[in-house]
Amino acid sequence: MGNHLNNKRIAKNTLMLYIRMGVSMIVSLYTSRIVLQTLGIEDYGIYSVVAGIISMFTFLNGALSQATSRFITFELGKKDFVQLNKIFSAAFVNHIILALIILFFAESIGTWFLYNKLVIPEYRLDAAFWVYQCSIATTLLGIVQVPYGSLIMAHEKMGIYAYLSIFDVVLKLILVFLLSYLSVDKLIFWAFCGVFVTILYNTFNYIYCHKHFKESHISFYKEISLYKKLFTYSFWDFIGSLSSLAQGQGQNMMLNIFFDPTINAARGIAMTIQGAIVQFSSNFTIASNPQITKLYANGNIKEMMNLIYNSSCLSFFLLYVFALPLCLEIDYVLQIWLGTYPDYTQIFTLLIITNSLIWSIKSYRVTALHATGHIKLSNLTVGVILC
């Protein structure tokens, strides 16, 4: 009976996420086309690389977010709501501290990097500065809302997650149409639009959690062990996040240093395509991950392993079905979608799709590993190999 209810819940949540995916993918791809046409290739490339600077510092958030999601879902699986409130409150405080740390480094090291290392035309440096400031604001707002997002996902309220995501992309589409008719610096205006959308998204997240989940009411506990538990777990996950940074934004920075902004534009478009196609498999991943952690918390190891195996096969198949025709007809797809696009966009897209196929096989095993809490050895190994 328990398995049937879990499978039914996963199926329902997956359906909601596919509805979200369909709407978000169509709107996002169309929005990207309008943004590229409105900003132009050079400004689009500047936006991509400048916004990427802040990512050099947010790998810390990736580690802490993973810890927050794991511990919230784990305690919810055990149905220990007192401990759940303690974990949520400690996680919120930790994310506030992290946001302040990132703000310090972003405004010091990041600003220096912007003016001294990136290849940006001198007449666009002022615009690049404001894009960077907006990227910092958007990132910090995203960091402090992580505990609320983790709580929604742990409760498996995928409908709310879907509605908020659709709201996000539709609002951006409305704003980009507005952008086309304004006589302002379009690059700067688009950066401020990102901040505005993030503020609204965070507000809705907070209101929903505060109304439906009592454990989201912040209480300040003096139990140092709570904060230590989250930070210790995050520290080992930090090693893995560092390797991801080296692969992702490190590549972006190197491309800019050795080439020019049009290459960053090509990679930025490829990353947009990756974000769209990965949703075909990640919807099932998002729906299944909370169940994997909860099953481990309850000691249902055999059921957890069955879920991991079945989910891995289905995720790879869903992604492969979509990725294969895209790879075979990449030139045609880019022509229909963008019209004019930067050189090397095809090559970047094919490489990124291949990487996504590999990741779809291992993602559930990573979730199970995080559920156990024993992540020290694996992250050290990955960090040494990739970095």
Region locations from a protein language model:
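Signature of the first transmembrane helix
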Residues: 9-74, 103-107, 172-173, 232-262, ...
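Alpha-helical transmembrane segments of polytopic membrane transporters and translocases
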Residues: 45-61, 90-93, 200, 235-238, ...
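Hydrophobic alpha-helical transmembrane segments
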Residues: 20, 133, 162-211, 233, ...
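Membrane-interface junctions at transmembrane-helix termini in multi-pass inner-membrane proteins
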Residues: 137-167, 188, 209, 353-384
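Helix-loop junctions and terminal segments of transmembrane helices
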Residues: 62-78, 154, 213-214, 270, ...
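Interhelical loop/hinge segments that connect adjacent transmembrane helices in multipass membrane
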Residues: 1-10, 187-191, 205-248, 291-306
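Membrane-water interface segments that mark the loop-to-transmembrane alpha-helix transition
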Residues: 12-24, 62-115, 126-136, 302-323, ...
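Interfacial segments at transmembrane-helix termini and the short loops linking adjacent helices
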Residues: 4, 112-134, 327-359
